[in-house]
């Protein structure tokens, strides 16, 4: 509202909704997921590990740490920027910040795992990077629109696919989310995370490295 102080949470929310943070995360995820394959490191240790698929879990843990540090660092950095620009520091509602931050953290991590799976399955950094970046852009709304149209032609009305996708949840999560909205977002994030880790592990286990 006019006359109100701009809080750190206001700017963080705007950047998060615009997928500013997730863009950096997915680029790193693609590069990190295939770095050890390209360097030959996996070939050296692959024979020593009975279940190579378990190496995906170590990647996912590393990406989880990176995601947490990136999101937390971005929030604190925004606080410093607000203080420099506005000569004062107002964080915003602690309850809203906590619920929104944790929910977005889960959603961002799920999208990072999706990009990890894409990179591992395709084994092509260029194509994987293009797909990852497209996931963070409005181009996905075109895909969602086509899916919605196809579903409506099947007789199912009022169906919106973006309500069940990670990118959709990232964009739709309100500034002061309710408990149900957070639970729904966490549910979508968990489902995608489990599927992506399982798919990546299965492919990595069977692939000739």
Indicate where each model-derived feature is located:
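Transmembrane helix boundary and interhelical loop/hinge segments in multi-pass membrane proteins
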Residues: 29-53, 60
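Small-residue-rich transmembrane alpha-helices that serve as helix-helix interface/gating elements
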Residues: 162-167, 186-195
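Transmembrane helix segments
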Residues: 125-162
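Short loop-to-helix capping motifs
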Residues: 50-51, 123-125
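Secretory targeting signals
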Residues: 1-32, 56-123, 132, 137-141, ...
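Perimembrane helix-loop junctions in membrane proteins
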Residues: 39, 82, 86-90, 148-152, ...
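Junction motif at the cytosolic side of a transmembrane helix
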Residues: 191-209
């Amino acid at each position: 509202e006019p006359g109100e102080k701009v809080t750190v949470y206001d700017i963080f929310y705007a950047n998060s909704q615009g997928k500013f943070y997730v863009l950096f995360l997915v680029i790193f995820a693609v590069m990190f997921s295939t770095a050890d394959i390209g360097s030959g490191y996996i070939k050296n240790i692959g024979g020593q590990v009975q279940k190579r698929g378990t190496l995906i879990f170590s990647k996912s843990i590393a990406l989880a740490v990176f995601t947490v540090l990136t999101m937390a660092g971005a929030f604190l950095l925004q606080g410093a920027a607000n203080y420099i620009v506005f000569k004062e520091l107002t964080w915003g509602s602690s309850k809203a910040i906590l619920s929104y931050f944790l929910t977005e953290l889960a959603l961002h991590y799920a999208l990072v795992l999706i990009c990890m799976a894409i990179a591992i399955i395709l084994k092509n950094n260029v194509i994987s990077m293009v797909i990852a970046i497209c996931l963070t852009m409005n181009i996905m709304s075109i895909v969602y629109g086509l899916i919605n149209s196809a579903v409506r032609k099947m007789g199912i009305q009022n169906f919106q696919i973006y309500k069940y996708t990670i990118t959709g949840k990232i964009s739709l999560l309100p500034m002061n989310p309710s408990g149900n909205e957070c639970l729904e977002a966490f549910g979508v994030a968990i489902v995608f995370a489990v599927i992506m880790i399982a798919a990546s592990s299965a492919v990595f286990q069977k692939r000739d490295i």
